[in-house]
Amino acid sequence: MSKKLPVGIQVYGLRDLLENTPENFKNVMEQVKALGYDGVELAGLYGLTPEYVKEVLDEVGLVPISAHVAFAEMMEDLDTIIADYKKIGVQYLVMPYMAEEYRPVNPEGFQKFLPMLNEVGKKIHDAGMTFLYHNHDFEFVKMEDGQWGYDVMFASIPHDNLMP
């Protein structure tokens, strides 16, 4: 007998359906579950409390796997972000995007960015969560020394503090 592999959906793709009202969030999550999904990767709290998000996901039967959180938001109030997503039951916080000034095509900005990224990752790891990076094409450019920006990023930051 084969075992069913759980399937999750990235809620970012449904963002236009999510308003800052509990009714829409619950309705969308019910529809996600009805489509056969087992879990979700959140992309913000949509103006809702973490307690309400957890309540809806528990009621509907969806596992909160991870959450995309903008790096700028993490830099502003990481403690609250960690606390909120831990209340929901999220294990993985994902940085979904790298601002242009920090990309490998801007070596000075990229080198400034790496210690900040490591600091955020360490704090997330110390809180018992895992920090992930959602890549795009702009990390895959060669630096002046011939190394790929993506490789430099992951070689510069301990694996406990950042995972691909």
Residue ranges and their predicted role:
Residues 34, 83-95, 112, 116-128:
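CE4/NodB-like, metal-dependent polysaccharide N-deacetylase domain
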